[in-house]
Amino acid sequence: SAASDVYKRQVLIDMSSIDPTESKAISAALAEKGIDMLDAPVSGGEPKAIDGTISVMVGGKRETFDKYYELLMNMAGSAVYVGPIGSGNVAKLANQIIVAVNIAAVSEALTLATKAGTDPELVYQAIRGGLAGSTVLDAKAPMMMDRNFKPGFRIELHMKDLNNALNAGHAVNAALPLTAELMEIMQSLKADGCEKEDHSSIVKYYEKISNVFVERERK
């Protein structure tokens, strides 16, 4: 049905986040009908999607990317060509690994600060200007300390991406031990009923095993 819908357009730009092997299979099926495909997953979360500054990671033929670059830039802050079909989703999986590990690191650090009797807000302010500063730190540390787990990106969706990353890693004999550990952490959160919360709720796992509660000090 996808092929019939795009037949006259001659190209399918798939912006979903899926296993790279699925992108390749879809592309092969479309190619039999003379239709090109780009796999073009995005990153940046809901806020950047709303304001049109998401990052797009694109796989497919270079000439097809060049042809539709301006179209992609109408909705994005950046659109980067990564390589042949499936490469966009490889980049997205790499992105999701980095985001998950960073959120876990922020959670672990703020748990340490709180358990040591130090105001996590002041620790956050102290480190955000140094090498540990990052987009993830600035986006997720305040959410953790404010106990705001309204989903920008849900745990269950991040689990889907990490599962795809593990499958992709196994397919090419790449060991992904941190990804596997994060999957187990998220599985624990799912068992606690947190799967529909924002992935910043990873901090709850650390709170549970350390018997501590991360939040801003009340003035």
PLM feature spans:
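Interdomain hinge/lid region at the active-site interface
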Residues: 85, 89, 133-135, 139-199
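Catalytic-core elements of nucleic-acid end-processing and repair enzymes
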Residues: 13
